[in-house]
Design a protein with these regions (language model features):
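Residue-level signature of transmembrane alpha-helix interfaces in integral membrane proteins
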Residues: 27, 69, 75, 131-133, ...
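Generic anion/oxyanion-binding catalytic loop in active/binding sites
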Residues: 27, 85, 196
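Generic helix-packing signal
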Residues: 9, 45, 100-101, 133, ...
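Conserved N-terminal catalytic core of the sugar/cofactor nucleotidyltransferase
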Residues: 1-7, 14-18, 22, 30-115, ...
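Extracytoplasmic/periplasmic beta-strand context in beta-sandwich domains
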Residues: 26-27, 157
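Short beta-strand segments
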Residues: 7-9, 57, 112-115, 144-148, ...
Length: 210
């Protein structure tokens, strides 16, 4: 199936102030390499098969900055969707899905939703997880990516999964918003709780029908 990356780049990056500012938030900064976090997000998709032009969802004030950074890495076939005001991720993802359907790009395509400010080192494992997710999405599933927790972090949401694995994936039992310290420690002791990465794979019509 075709893969249409959807890059969520609307964050304000206020937690990294003063390095990250409202008009120049962290996703546009080069923090771990000579490329910005937005650019790295797209470049780490190199090597995957059937990648289509990406959709970048961003704040209206950042539209020219996004276009400039995409041009710098030779991404010329992109779509930039503008948010007049910052909202949470759900409306941004829905807008991207509607755009794909309206532009008649949906046929045999999945959306790969990624945040523009993630740091991912193990690209091989990342690509493997994406390919597993695509196989699941072919069966009209909405797939999310969990991260194995390394500490009882209360800054992340968590995913509770079933114990049984099927084709490299687990069934989601529930999503838990940021827990308190005691609850986070309990999650860390179990093997079926993961940090919610905010990354997804699905067919556009499946999300809209939800």
């Amino acid at each position: 199936m075709k893969i249409i990356p959807v890059i969520l780049s609307g964050g304000s990056g206020t937690r990294l102030w003063p390095l990250s500012r409202k008009q120049y938030p962290k996703q546009f900064l080069a923090l771990d390499s000579q490329k910005s976090m937005l650019q790295e997000t797209l470049l780490r998709l190199n090597g995957l098969s059937n990648i289509e032009g990406p959709i970048v969802v961003c704040n209206v004030n950042h539209r020219f900055l996004v276009a400039e950074q995409l041009n710098e890495i030779d991404v010329f076939d992109s779509t930039i969707l503008l948010e007049p005001v910052a909202r949470n991720t759900a409306p941004a993802i829905a807008a991207a899905a509607f755009n794909v359907i309206q532009q008649k790009r949906e046929g045999k395509a999945v959306l790969l939703v990624l945040s523009a400010d993630h740091l991912i080192k193990d690209i091989k494992a990342f690509h493997k997880a994406i390919n597993i997710a695509i196989e699941c999405a072919k069966h009209e599933k909405i797939v999310t990516f969990g991260i194995v927790p390394t500490e009882a972090n209360i800054g992340y949401g968590y995913i509770k999964t079933s114990k049984s694995e099927k084709n490299g994936a687990f069934k989601v039992e529930s999503f838990i918003e940021k827990p308190n310290q005691i609850t986070a420690k309990k999650f860390l002791e179990k093997d079926n709780y993961f940090w919610n990465s905010g990354m997804f794979v699905f067919q556009p019509h499946v999300l809209i029908n939800e």
